[in-house]
């Protein structure tokens, strides 16, 4: 009876999983085309702005980037009926001010040295725990005249780490002399000053009131009082404070003698103190028409808000109306009293780098609190971006160079005198000198005491980078994961979504996994799969089984696999797949796949230093029918593939991705990485051209991600800690154009990633114990989350990863308290290194869960509101399990379904899948039940999937060492989501109920703790 019950339970689970295959939402098609596509036009376009006086004479002109969203007022949704989730502070201080957060007041080492060019540098190193997550790691800061570089290095109790190896990881291998350790505790004050050169933690913004028809700055600054709407706007920005006796951040205003006015507007936002220089609150002089005192403050603000009254048709404000060489960003605010909404327009000086968040379409806000949050974030990000302009960057570089050289001159004499305490250049960092233990402990205690005093002084002064815990900010972030399968017992190698289930390659074989239902075996362990692609639109499964020299590519029909699962067949073995292998791919170590734009499937297989181009023979649109879907399991799609050509390279590629040409008739490209370079290869001619050369002794290639900016291909080249964006210029007369572009940019990750996922507007880097999230357009950091034992397994549509936590079976309070006590700055340890608990304590077991970040959460909530379905008719075929062919009908999809419609569709779909429906003919209102698999298959036969559907994936790469399993899932994904808005079973992908997500990647504490317990 027990056996029969288990069989019935597994059969029921299998039935539920198979039903979900056909319940994919059409949202995926809308999101897929957005994932890898991005446009800088969302961030404005550069215009020449000319201002004139009342007589029409030209006064001034300037080039500014203008952001005004879209002028389309006929949006499908009214402004204010949605909530943005892409409003983030870029490079937030609580993530970037490392020295204050992780070093100051803690035991750490500081070193001084000269590079090969005899320029001095400083290095700070500490070993810290990532917020009691039992993830010890090294943090290092390199201070140079060009700026600071920050990296994290993994901690290993068995592997020694020297200063030389840390500098080598920062690409600094040559020195004039070996670095020497600085023991003087006062060095902490000097290094804190160096970090403060990155910019102020607090901000001052100008607020200028302009009446209707005012065209010059003299007229605007001469407004003695504001209007009622202007006062309402000031109340929205912050609190009105009395300057005399004010003890908070004053923003350059006089708080003793009232020489800069009696009142001002002040607020605190996410730990930042903000003082507004309001024109009507600054001193007014009837004799001075130019109002010099007002211009002195507002004219010296980097960012100024201009509140302009009047109708939309009246002459609008232009930055050239203001005579200021210092103000780089103007935010034009208009208030509509009739509709009670605000309209926003941003002007940025041409040299200011792009910054977010992009304005919505249309840029109108009816939710005033949402408008305040958006405006403050935009202004803070704008001032930070302005500091990266050549003018400010050169000043900061000169100041930093002067401070470093001055500090170097002051310290060198003391270092030469105190040779007894000098440590060897190659000393292991965690070890302290065995001799004079008591003296060393006393020195460390004094070192920590002085550091804590400096930290307290900065906090009292208001210059400390505060955490979000003090700001009360609590919002759901788009990257918040959901638990897909708890207590996953296997080691995942790679995976790919199949409908709403997940096809996972594990150490026990390939399994079909969905939620906490029992896993269904598809292939046994004799077929060790390292890469896979589930192509539902083509009814294909492509995978690479790696078994030494016998490695090959295998192709299967999904319908045949599904039929076998319905028949409760055991998992296929390698011997059962003889008819499904592509013989010429023997010995392959990597492959990449591409289906966007093209009418045919393209696969490039790497066999040592040889590339083999394979395509699938083009099927006619009528080729995909219900009859072909029910073909026998023995029928293999191998005969449908043809070998086009072979291309020989100079070395075996470690990373490979396919790039579409700029037009249908243009040559497609292959980007490969080997040795110390990234090359692009013409698929037609086999010619290879250098794209980028890596200047480093050791190179760890991570990914080459193809993205498309306004239809033009670009590549994100990722290696070591670096990520570079380069435009891919088309072939011209047989030659490849390699030239620098103004759109190219480069940034560094804080921790070396093993996988990168692009989901516009975000770039997600996966490391062994953290997730780092940046923006595609500028590489700015928006979030860092600690995720112990993080392993990415799939990213082609939704992102799936596993994470391991130490779950205490008895109590979770003791270990947490112990970790806190160990890290308390009040009790400095007697060694150079704090003692960390082991990854698993006594009475604890490993718990590995499978998590999911829905793609629609990342790419579906930015720019437009709401996301609109393409208004085109599509031909829909019935779900696969129905054996009777049904007539196809054109259907226009809509994302706005009521709850009753969703339930009705789900119920009708379930009845038809189980063969309980008496109606064989289709109905127009039932069309959404024919989910994405049959629809996409027919779209492919008629001309391929929608452009851009797979554009945001990380490239295929060779796994290395322990990172093999996570990185192979990066293979050029196909952009459709496995999630569904229309399936009640999949309702978990929306806003999860309390407790549905085991941890949240949101900023609640100093390091945004993720609790996996």
UniProtKB/Swiss-Prot annotation:
<feature type="modified residue" description="Phosphothreonine">
    <location>
        <position position="827"/>
    </location>
</feature>
<comment type="similarity">
    <text>Belongs to the GARNL3 family.</text>
</comment>
<protein>
    <recommendedName>
        <fullName>GTPase-activating Rap/Ran-GAP domain-like protein 3</fullName>
    </recommendedName>
</protein>
<feature type="compositionally biased region" description="Polar residues">
    <location>
        <begin position="993"/>
        <end position="1003"/>
    </location>
</feature>
<keyword id="KW-0597">Phosphoprotein</keyword>
<feature type="region of interest" description="Disordered">
    <location>
        <begin position="913"/>
        <end position="1013"/>
    </location>
</feature>
<dbReference type="GO" id="GO:0005096">
    <property type="term" value="F:GTPase activator activity"/>
</dbReference>
<keyword id="KW-0343">GTPase activation</keyword>
<feature type="compositionally biased region" description="Low complexity">
    <location>
        <begin position="811"/>
        <end position="821"/>
    </location>
</feature>
<dbReference type="GO" id="GO:0051056">
    <property type="term" value="P:regulation of small GTPase mediated signal transduction"/>
</dbReference>
<feature type="domain" description="Rap-GAP">
    <location>
        <begin position="191"/>
        <end position="407"/>
    </location>
</feature>
<dbReference type="InterPro" id="IPR000331">
    <property type="entry name" value="Rap/Ran_GAP_dom"/>
</dbReference>
<feature type="domain" description="CNH">
    <location>
        <begin position="489"/>
        <end position="800"/>
    </location>
</feature>
<dbReference type="InterPro" id="IPR035974">
    <property type="entry name" value="Rap/Ran-GAP_sf"/>
</dbReference>
<feature type="compositionally biased region" description="Low complexity">
    <location>
        <begin position="952"/>
        <end position="962"/>
    </location>
</feature>
<feature type="compositionally biased region" description="Polar residues">
    <location>
        <begin position="963"/>
        <end position="982"/>
    </location>
</feature>
<feature type="region of interest" description="Disordered">
    <location>
        <begin position="810"/>
        <end position="842"/>
    </location>
</feature>
<dbReference type="Pfam" id="PF00780">
    <property type="entry name" value="CNH"/>
</dbReference>
<dbReference type="InterPro" id="IPR050989">
    <property type="entry name" value="Rap1_Ran_GAP"/>
</dbReference>
<dbReference type="InterPro" id="IPR001180">
    <property type="entry name" value="CNH_dom"/>
</dbReference>
<feature type="modified residue" description="Phosphoserine">
    <location>
        <position position="426"/>
    </location>
</feature>
<feature type="modified residue" description="Phosphoserine">
    <location>
        <position position="432"/>
    </location>
</feature>
<feature type="modified residue" description="Phosphoserine">
    <location>
        <position position="45"/>
    </location>
</feature>
<dbReference type="Pfam" id="PF02145">
    <property type="entry name" value="Rap_GAP"/>
</dbReference>
């Amino acid at each position: 009876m027990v056996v029969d019950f288990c069989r019935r339970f597994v059969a029921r689970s299998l039935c539920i999983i198979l039903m979900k295959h056909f319940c994919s939402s059409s949202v995926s098609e809308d999101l897929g085309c957005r994932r890898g596509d991005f446009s800088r036009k969302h961030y404005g376009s550069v215009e020449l702005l000319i201002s004139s006086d009342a007589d029409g004479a030209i006064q001034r002109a300037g080039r500014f980037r203008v952001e005004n969203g879209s002028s389309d007022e006929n949006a499908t949704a009214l402004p204010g009926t949605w909530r943005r989730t892409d409003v983030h502070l870029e490079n937030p201080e609580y993530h970037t001010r490392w020295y204050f957060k992780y070093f100051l007041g803690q035991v750490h080492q500081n070193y001084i040295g000269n590079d090969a060019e005899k320029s001095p540098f400083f290095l700070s190193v500490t070993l810290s725990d990532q917020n009691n997550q039992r993830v010890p790691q090294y943090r290092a800061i390199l201070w140079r005249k060009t700026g600071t570089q920050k990296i994290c290095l993994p901690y290993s109790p068995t592997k020694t780490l020297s200063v030389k190896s840390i500098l080598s990881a920062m690409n600094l291998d040559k020195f004039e002399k070996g670095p020497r350790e600085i023991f003087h505790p006062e060095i902490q004050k000097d290094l804190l000053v160096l970090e403060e050169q990155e910019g102020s933690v607090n901000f001052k913004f100008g607020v200028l009131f302009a009446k209707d028809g005012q065209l010059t700055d003299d007229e605007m600054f001469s407004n003695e009082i504001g209007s009622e709407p202007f006062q309402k706007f000031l109340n929205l920005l912050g609190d009105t404070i009395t300057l005399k006796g004010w003890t908070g951040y004053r923003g350059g205003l006089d708080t003793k003698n009232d020489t800069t006015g009696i009142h001002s507007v002040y607020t605190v936002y996410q730990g930042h103190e903000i003082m507004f220089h309001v024109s009507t609150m600054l001193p007014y002089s009837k004799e001075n028409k130019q109002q010099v005192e007002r211009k002195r403050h507002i004219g010296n603000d980097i960012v100024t808000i201009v509140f302009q009254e009047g109708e939309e048709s009246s002459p609008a404000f232009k930055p050239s109306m203001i005579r200021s060489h210092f103000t780089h960003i103007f935010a034009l605010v208009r208030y509509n009293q009739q509709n009670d909404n605000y309209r926003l327009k941003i002007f940025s000086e041409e040299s200011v780098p792009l910054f977010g968040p992009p304005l919505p379409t249309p840029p109108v806000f009816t939710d005033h609190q949402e408008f305040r949050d958006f405006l403050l974030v935009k202004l803070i990000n704008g001032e930070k971006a302005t500091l990266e302009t050549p003018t400010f960057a050169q000043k900061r570089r000169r100041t930093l160079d002067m401070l470093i050289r001055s500090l170097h001159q002051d310290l060198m004499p003391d270092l030469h005198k105190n040779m007894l305490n000098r440590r060897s250049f190659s000393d292991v960092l965690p070890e302290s000198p065995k001799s004079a233990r008591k003296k060393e402990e006393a020195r460390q205690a004094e070192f920590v005491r002085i550091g804590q005093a400096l930290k307290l002084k900065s906090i009292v002064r208001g210059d400390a980078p505060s955490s979000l815990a003090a700001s009360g900010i609590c919002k759901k972030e788009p990257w918040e994961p959901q638990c897909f399968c708890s207590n996953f017992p296997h080691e995942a190698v790679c995976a790919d979504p199949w409908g709403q289930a997940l096809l996972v390659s594990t150490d026990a074989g390939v399994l079909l996994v969905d939620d906490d239902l029992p896993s269904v075996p598809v292939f046994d362990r004799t077929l060790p799969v390292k890469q896979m692609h589930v192509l539902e639109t083509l009814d294909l499964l492509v995978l690479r089984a790696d078994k030494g020299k016998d490695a090959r590519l295998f192709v299967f029909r999904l319908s045949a696999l599904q039929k076998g699962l319905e028949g409760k067949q055991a998992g296929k073995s390698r011997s059962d797949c003889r008819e499904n292998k592509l013989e010429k791919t023997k010995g392959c170590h990597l492959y990449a796949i591409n289906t966007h734009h093209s009418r045919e499937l393209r696969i490039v297989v790497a066999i040592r230093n040889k590339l083999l181009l394979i395509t699938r023979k083009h099927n006619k649109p009528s080729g995909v029918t219900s009859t072909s879907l029910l073909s026998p399991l023995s029928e293999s799609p191998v005969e449908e593939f043809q070998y086009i050509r072979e291309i020989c390279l100079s070395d075996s590629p470690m990373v490979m991705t396919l790039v579409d040409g700029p037009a249908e008739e243009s040559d497609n490209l292959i980007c490969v990485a080997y040795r110390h370079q990234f090359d692009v290869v013409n698929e037609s001619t086999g010619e290879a051209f250098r794209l980028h050369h890596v200047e480093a002794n050791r190179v760890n290639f991570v990914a080459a991600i193809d993205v498309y900016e306004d239809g033009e291909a670009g590549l994100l080249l990722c290696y070591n800690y670096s990520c570079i964006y380069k435009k891919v210029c088309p072939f011209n007369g047989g030659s490849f154009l390699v030239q620098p572009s103004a759109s190219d940019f480069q940034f560094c990750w804080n921790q070396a990633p093993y996988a990168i996922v692009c989901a516009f507007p975000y770039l997600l880097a996966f490391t062994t114990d953290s997730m780092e999230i940046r923006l595609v357009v500028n590489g700015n950091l928006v979030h860092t989350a600690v995720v112990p034992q993080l392993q990415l397994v799939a990213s082609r549509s939704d992102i799936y990863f596993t994470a391991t936590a130490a779950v205490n079976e008895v109590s979770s309070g003791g270990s947490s308290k112990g970790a806190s006590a160990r890290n308390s700055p009040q009790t400095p340890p007697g060694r150079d290194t704090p003692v960390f608990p082991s990854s698993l304590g006594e009475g604890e077991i490993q718990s590995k869960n499978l998590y999911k970040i829905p793609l629609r959460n990342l790419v579906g909530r930015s720019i437009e509101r709401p996301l609109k379905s393409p208004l085109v008719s599509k031909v829909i075929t019935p779900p696969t399990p129905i054996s009777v062919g049904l007539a196809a009908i054109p259907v226009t999809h809509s994302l706005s379904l009521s709850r009753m419609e969703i339930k009705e569709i789900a119920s009708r779909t379930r009845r038809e899948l189980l063969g309980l429906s008496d109606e064989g003919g289709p109905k127009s209102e039932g069309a959404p039940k024919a989910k994405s698999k049959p629809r996409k298959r027919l779209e492919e036969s008629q001309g391929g999937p929608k452009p851009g559907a797979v554009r945001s994936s990380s490239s295929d790469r060779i796994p290395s060492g322990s990172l093999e399993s996570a990185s192979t899932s990066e293979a050029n994904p196909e952009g459709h989501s496995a999630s569904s808005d229309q399936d009640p079973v999949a309702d978990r992908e929306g806003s999860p109920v309390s407790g549905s997500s085991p941890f949240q990647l949101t900023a609640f504490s100093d390091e945004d703790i993720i609790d996996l317990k």
